[in-house]
């Protein structure tokens, strides 16, 4: 959980959590964590091209308030947010697109009393921590 810094200011009073999970088994662990929260959870997700995007995201269907897709900054091996959106369009999510990490966090900070969970790639989490 990020409790201070630039990104926490953007998140406002909402909790901001990062998790480097990027495979199917980690998605089950994250989904279980989400089930145990007493607040709505908004996901911010970016992944590498070689991952099982649909299976990873399927774990969160029916559990999250929304999913915001972004590109992994400074990483050529990531799937584009638009291609990612196409790959998971058959899943039941309220999908959003953002051009940046801080933009995605800001977009989700408008939902009161929620948790913003950034996940899907260790590269993404590294960029999040660098921003903060």
Tell me what each language-model feature is.
Residues 121:
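Active-site-proximal loop/hinge segments that shape catalytic or ion-binding/gating pockets
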Residues 124-126:
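Short, active-site-adjacent cap segments at secondary-structure transitions
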Residues 1-66:
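Nucleotide phosphate-binding/pyrophosphate-handling subdomain across enzymes
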Residues 15-16, 57-115:
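C-terminal helical cap/extension that packs against the catalytic core
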């Amino acid at each position: 959980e990020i409790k201070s810094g630039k990104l926490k200011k953007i998140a406002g009073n909402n909790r901001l959590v990062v998790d480097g999970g990027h495979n199917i088994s980690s998605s089950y662990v994250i989904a279980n964590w989400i089930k145990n929260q007493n607040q709505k959870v908004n996901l911010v997700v970016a992944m590498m091209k070689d991952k099982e995007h649909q299976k990873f995201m399927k774990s969160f269907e029916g559990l999250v308030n929304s999913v915001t897709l972004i590109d992994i900054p400074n990483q050529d091996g990531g799937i584009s947010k638009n291609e990612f959106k196409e790959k998971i369009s058959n899943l039941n999510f309220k999908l959003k697109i953002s051009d940046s990490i801080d933009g995605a966090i800001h977009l989700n900070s408008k939902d009161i009393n929620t948790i913003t969970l950034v996940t899907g790639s260790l590269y993404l989490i590294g960029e999040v921590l660098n921003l903060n």
